[in-house]
Amino acid sequence: PAGVTKLFVEAWGGGGGGAAGGGGGGGGYAATEWTVTPGAAVAINIGEGGEGASTPAGDGENAGNTTVTIGAIVLTAYGGQGAYAGSGGFGGRFNVNSGALMPYGQSGAAGESSREVYGAYSSTIFYTAVTYGKGGMAGNTSIENSNGGFRSVNNSSLVNIKLIYGKNGTEPGGGGGGDGTGISGNYGGPGLVIIHY
């Protein structure tokens, strides 16, 4: 806007997609104070959340990075990593490509890994239960994901005893919940940019 010479910019990357191994990583957070010329163009790219694994043995997708660009300077909040078939994804980080700015940032939290336990209903009926990990929180947020799925299976018949699908990550940048079905989606949450002036 006319007359504005300073901006305070906050950015969050997208959250990684979930998988059987756990939740996706949370998006990174980046913030900085920016001295600008009134009327300067600001280019913003919001990172998309990663898609969850499409098969029980597949990996979740990495999330997109969120960038804010003014002139040649780019502030980046990196997207979270998608979960693997065997573990949760790592959180995203942050960066600025110029020493002219002093950025503050916080990495996103890693997605929680899934946990498997075994038990018995009787001397002849045994089961396997998996608590799929929740997605990691984005950096500098207090919005916790509670989106991991759950599955218990009769080991003899392989019939589901109980099934709860993983859910999408919260906005901004929450990782998608863990899920071993490959059909629930469990996307990471999208990124976000807030500009204060």
Model-predicted regions and their roles:
Residues A11-I70, G89-N95, S142, N147-S156, ...:
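Glycine-rich strand-loop-strand elements at beta-sheet edges
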